[in-house]
């Protein structure tokens, strides 16, 4: 995307224009209403489960609590409450990741996405729904079999009705997510995760306050250090999300009829973090997989692997290293999905634009690829460090009250907030230009 140089509205102007845009107000109301509806569904329980026994088991098993705590990021507490929305948006996110991987590997899907336009995107969206349904069905069966030990009347009927309730809840959440994306503001799936993370924040703050009131000076000092690190993490996330490298682009002089258009300069913005929050979500999902398998299978080998990959285990440096490698790998993957230097070079050539000092065509694609590689490795390593440092500080200070609201949650929160704010600004600008055209 080539951007011309011009004035960008500041935050105050955008807020005033947002307040005056009736269409935007309607979209915001739709978004808020659907988010509230989805949040209320968290408290609808799956029938036939002894919640007292489940709650006692959850509190007595640290590993189980850690797994449930991470998965609750995507369900907003639905899994720990065993509600019908227990799966949350996770099947849809997993399906989206699978389709993105297949699009990069299967030529037919790649052609569908690149060359079929809106019709191709609709087909991929439909495929994503089918994969979401299959993934939700698989997860719901596993959970239904697992919670049989807490059933009031265990048996095949309980397993079937529990699985169906979980699948129905997951599909309803997916539908709400797509409604928000189409008729609201922002990305529906991201906003649902955002809401679920925010829902866990009051509990973490309450536990931290109680710990500060009952603890000694070292405990209070540890809490202060942890909060400072969290604030620094937010600053680092904003830097990674907003950091861009502007490559100058020059459009050649051209003549249309009797008019001669002079050469104009613009720039090509390359983000420091092309993948946004997806690399961190995917890396976290991979890391939690051994814990899920360990709790569902009770296999000794899987338990040992999960223990070594735990940030609270005997070898936290293995967790940190593995987490960093996964973030870097997925950052490269998403960078290649979002921006193709060969296609970019061809588009610049068709528009009669070029990068100063670089020949059009293959040389341009190689130049952009080199810049993109350097940006990606820098952004990915910085993103990995931002994700690891708060966890390391938690281990050093032994303050675990933010266990469910760690660096991963902060990365997702700030990233989604920035992306949504940009979409609001884009909508306001487009409304302003539409008004100018009508006038």
UniProtKB/Swiss-Prot annotation:
UniProt cross-references to PROSITE patterns, sorted A to Z: SECY_1, SECY_2
Topology term for the membrane: Multi-pass membrane protein
Key words of the record: Cell inner membrane, Cell membrane, Membrane, Protein transport, Thylakoid, Translocation, Transmembrane, Transmembrane helix, Transport
Any Pfam family the entry gives: SecY
SUPFAM superfamilies with a match to the protein in the record: Preprotein translocase SecY subunit
Transmembrane region(s): 28-48, 73-93, 127-147, 156-176, 179-199, 220-240, 276-296, 318-338, 375-395, 401-421
One of the record's GO cellular component terms: plasma membrane-derived thylakoid membrane
One GO BP: protein targeting
First-listed, main subcellular location of the protein, grouped into a coarse class: membrane
Compartments where found: Cell inner membrane; Cellular thylakoid membrane
Subunit structure: Component of the Sec protein translocase complex. Heterotrimer consisting of SecY, SecE and SecG subunits. The heterotrimers can form oligomers, although 1 heterotrimer is thought to be able to translocate proteins. Interacts with the ribosome. Interacts with SecDF, and other proteins may be involved. Interacts with SecA.
Sequence similarity: Belongs to the SecY/SEC61-alpha family.
Functional description taken from the UniProt entry: The central subunit of the protein translocation channel SecYEG. Consists of two halves formed by TMs 1-5 and 6-10. These two domains form a lateral gate at the front which open onto the bilayer between TMs 2 and 7, and are clamped together by SecE at the back. The channel is closed by both a pore ring composed of hydrophobic SecY resides and a short helix (helix 2A) on the extracellular side of the membrane which forms a plug. The plug probably moves laterally to allow the channel to open. The ring and the pore may move independently.
Protein's name according to its UniProt entry: Protein translocase subunit SecY
Organism: Synechococcus elongatus (strain ATCC 33912 / PCC 7942 / FACHB-805) (Anacystis nidulans R2)
